[in-house]
């Protein structure tokens, strides 16, 4: 099939897009409370199940083959398959169903539509993409176009916390050859992002009454020495290896805990650190870098005791080659639709994309700066453009031989 044929076929499908319908879908999805419960037990309004049930029903109404697996009770992954001819790749459109919390956000679930914007928690992160995925499948179905390969729509749980959904789906879910994850990129094409690992550095001392501090060992004082030893680590990362899209790794001390009462010398202190790492960097490398700075403290002071625990959080890095068919198809689609080559960049945060067991790209409607805010919104026009972009890319990608 030539590029002109791709364009004609995509245009037939795009003609079936209904902007009012995709806007209504998005507004409805926002009204469904799917806040991530984080470490608490799932409860009404704090789990993905209610949204999953509505989304499954919408996929079934389009006559997709659907499935559901609960990763934990009340927290499912779901999917719908639009069958093709069996002669092309399986393309996945994936997004998470959970959102962050809504404290201080009274209109979080309004789904208000005003002046070309849709407001509410999850509007851009990332229910806009979920609504766009539905419209892609509907437009294909209503156009009566039979694709060479299958289209797989996937809703994932727990992205905002431990990414349990995508980790489970990558291991046990239906397989795809390529995936687009619709996180808010303002339709920039992001085939890479750094990973994230958090570690705990713990110092130990000897507790005594603070009237005789010289008889004990102060774990907080030792942690202060650790913090001093780590000064400059972030700057060193800037001068170390670079990734063509992700740039350099980053380090940030984030949380410190220690002591119980001021009248006791503390015997324990803990520092939680965040390390954004480049594709290819390992936990062992990171721990070795930390130890190289802290071990000299122990060598010069017999009372200095510490350990490094983790990673507690481990979000994988993404590194899909820019020459991958999924990247090239999105570039071709965006160039045709919007008149100029699109920006190819690294996504600033972590996503489900590297867990899906296939080449993946992050690309979706919405501005990441609006995510997690108390006035979250997305432009309807960009959601519709996302539907067009996905359709063009899918039609192009379906000619890829895997």
Question: Predicted regions span which residues?
Answer:
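Acidic/histidine-rich catalytic neighborhood of metal-dependent amide-processing enzymes
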Residues: 126-198, 402
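Glycine/serine-rich anion-binding loops at beta->alpha junctions
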Residues: 117-131, 209, 363
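Phosphate-handling active-site elements
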Residues: 104, 114-116, 136-152, 230-240, ...
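Metal-dependent amide/peptide-bond hydrolase catalytic core
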Residues: 1-10, 14-17, 70-72, 191, ...
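Acidic-glycine-rich active-site phosphate/pyrophosphate-binding loop
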Residues: 98-114, 191-202, 329-333
């Amino acid at each position: 099939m030539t590029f002109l044929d791709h364009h004609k076929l995509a245009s037939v499908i795009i003609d079936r897009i209904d902007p009012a319908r995709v806007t209504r879908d998005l507004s409805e999805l926002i009204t469904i409370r799917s806040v991530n419960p984080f470490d608490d037990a799932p409860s009404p309004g704090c789990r993905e199940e209610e949204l999953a049930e509505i989304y499954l029903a919408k996929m079934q109404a389009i006559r997709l083959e659907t499935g559901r697996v609960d990763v934990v009770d009340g927290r499912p992954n779901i999917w719908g398959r639009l069958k093709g001819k069996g002669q092309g790749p399986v393309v996945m459109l994936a997004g998470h169903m959970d959102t962050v919390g809504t404290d201080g956000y009274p209109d979080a679930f309004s789904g208000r539509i005003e002046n070309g914007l849709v407001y509410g928690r999850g509007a851009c992160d990332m229910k806009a993409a979920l609504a766009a995925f539905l419209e892609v499948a509907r437009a294909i179905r209503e156009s009566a176009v039979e694709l060479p390969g299958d289209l797989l729509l996937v809703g994932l749980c727990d992205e905002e916390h431990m990414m349990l959904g995508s980790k489970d789906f990558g291991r046990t879910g239906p397989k795809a050859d390529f995936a687009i994850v619709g996180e808010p990129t303002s339709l920039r094409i992001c085939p890479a992002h750094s990973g994230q690992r958090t570690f705990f550095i713990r110092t130990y001392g000897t507790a005594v009454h603070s009237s005789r501090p010289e008889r004990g060992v102060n774990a907080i004082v030792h942690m202060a020495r650790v913090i001093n030893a780590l000064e400059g680590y972030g700057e060193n990362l800037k001068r170390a290896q670079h990734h063509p899209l992700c740039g350099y790794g980053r380090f940030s001390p984030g949380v410190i805990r220690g002591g119980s009462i001021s009248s006791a010398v503390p015997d324990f202190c803990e520092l939680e650190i965040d390390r954004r790492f480049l594709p290819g960097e390992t936990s062992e490398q990171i721990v070795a870098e930390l130890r190289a700075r802290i071990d000299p403290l122990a060598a010069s002071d017999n009372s200095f005791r510490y350990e490094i625990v983790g990673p507690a959080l481990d979000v994988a890095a993404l590194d899909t080659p820019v020459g991958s068919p999924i990247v090239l198809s999105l570039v071709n689609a965006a160039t045709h639709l919007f008149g100029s080559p699109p920006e190819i960049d690294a996504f600033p945060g972590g996503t489900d994309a590297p867990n899906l067991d296939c080449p993946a790209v992050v690309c979706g409607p919405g501005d990441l700066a609006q995510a997690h805010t108390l006035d979250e919104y997305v432009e309807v026009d960009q959601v519709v453009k996302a539907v067009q972009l996905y359709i063009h890319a899918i039609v192009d990608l379906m000619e890829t031989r895997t």
